[in-house]
Amino acid sequence: MSSESKTTPVQNWVLNAKEGVMALPRTIIDPLCPTRFTREAEPIRAAILSRAEFIERSKAEQDFRYKQIIPYIVLQHARKFLLIRRTPKQGETRLHDKFSLGIGGHINTIDKAEGDILETGMRRELNEEIKVHREEACRLVGVINDDTKEVDRVHLGLVYLLTCKTPGFTNREPEAYTALWQTPDEIAAVFEQMESWAKIVYEEVIRNKPA
């Protein structure tokens, strides 16, 4: 980076800060994401890149003035989606034995300061948990801002839809979760056992998605 190059507040913070998680004040989030699922994701994405802060995770979990930014990657092959079941060995105790439709985690200070930190963090989280053998495309399809559950009150979900050319994948954390491709009807059969974000993704992204 040249001496004349300008960096965003997020990039400057990453270059100098201690370990932390990316979070955005609710005063910024709620006007941009007034419902539980917002399809127009670019305004909140831009706000995150320009105005996000990094705070210690232990504090962030208790501070309801902020929401931690979580990339939530949904995998699709043909008309099937990857359904995940978290085991008791998975770190987040509030999600044990729940079904999920997304892979993801926090954006933190090990992610690159150069370029798009959201893209970098999303890719890091995906690659830590699963290896997609042949990817076709990946795009941001919406934002989850839901306060139904305690865990949701401090997290904001950026929902990415990753389409795969083939069904092949490698589970890098088999002790933490199991995963298999399922049709929308098969997913509907376990709807009541799904975590809250997965329910939202099923209703807003999968159920009414064109074939």
Task: Give the positions of each predicted feature.
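A short coil-to-beta-strand element that immediately follows conserved catalytic motifs
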Residues: 133-142
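Conserved Nudix-box catalytic region and its N-terminal flanking loop in Nudix hydrolases
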Residues: 80-124, 128
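Residue-level detector of short, conserved catalytic/binding motifs and their immediate flanks
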Residues: 69-71, 118, 158
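Conserved aromatic-histidine-acidic binding/catalytic patches
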Residues: 61-65, 110-114, 118, 148, ...
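Short N-terminal binding/cap micro-motifs at the start of the first secondary-structure element
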Residues: 29-34
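Nudix hydrolase/Nudix homology domain
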Residues: 2-28, 97-110, 142-211
